[in-house]
A protein has these predicted regions:
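Short amphipathic alpha-helical interface segments
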Residues: 1-16
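Nucleic-acid-binding surface
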Residues: 20-22, 37, 45, 49-200
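Short amphipathic alpha-helical interaction segments
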Residues: 25-38
């Protein structure tokens, strides 16, 4: 089956997770999707999401596939941005205030809320540890979130100070962007006080 061999090549070229839209875009019929499952080439994680056999499920990709407006934040953002050496025990996501996530696993996922106007503020796309594209906040937004909501960030005082100190010693960080974000997030005063301690 020449076509089937090409389809398997298509699957091999994809990252660990494959969505039903990936198959549709490639004009692959459901007959072949079912055959891939029968042949133990892929398995169905949930409706519309498949993972290649012998690969680990990408929990980060699965979360964002299920909750489209969720953006990784706080400790999880620090992890994606290589600002921490420890893989967080909890996954932090930020969602719009009105977004319904009643079915989410709250023992594994810590939920933070923001306004609909600010949900995309500082959002960027990076690769998960499994090679899939996921959305997370940049370092500037993450620092603002941690400073504004220090009691909800999952960091103790020593960890928080270390993160902030390392962030402001990073030459690539945009300090003017932090101020701009702080104004939008209503934490400008706290951010300026922090910057006075760690920069000047």
């Amino acid at each position: 089956m020449k076509d089937y061999e090409k389809i398997k090549e298509f699957v091999n070229e994809k990252d660990n997770a494959i969505t039903v839209n990936d198959f549709k875009d490639a004009k692959i019929k459901f007959y072949y999707i079912n055959k891939l499952m029968e042949d133990n080439y892929i398995y169905k994680v949930r409706k519309g999401l498949y993972v290649k056999i012998n690969s680990f499920e990408d929990e980060y990709f699965t979360i964002q596939s299920r909750y489209k407006k969720a953006i990784f934040s706080y400790n999880t953002a620090l992890f994606f941005l290589n600002q921490t050496e420890v893989t967080p025990n909890m996954i932090d996501i930020t969602i719009p205030n009105e977004y319904n996530v009643s079915t989410i696993d709250r023992e594994r996922i810590r939920i933070h809320y923001t306004s609909r106007e600010n949900i995309e503020l500082g959002a960027i796309e990076l690769k998960s540890p499994f090679g899939n594209n996921v959305k997370t906040y940049n370092l500037e937004r993450t620092i603002c979130d941690i400073v504004k909501n220090e009691n909800k960030c999952g960091l103790d005082l020593e960890q928080k100070n270390k993160v902030i100190r390392n962030a402001f010693s990073n030459k690539e960080i945009d300090k003017s962007m932090i101020i701009e974000y702080a104004k939008r997030l209503k934490c400008e005063k706290k951010i300026r006080m922090i910057m006075e301690v760690f920069i000047w």
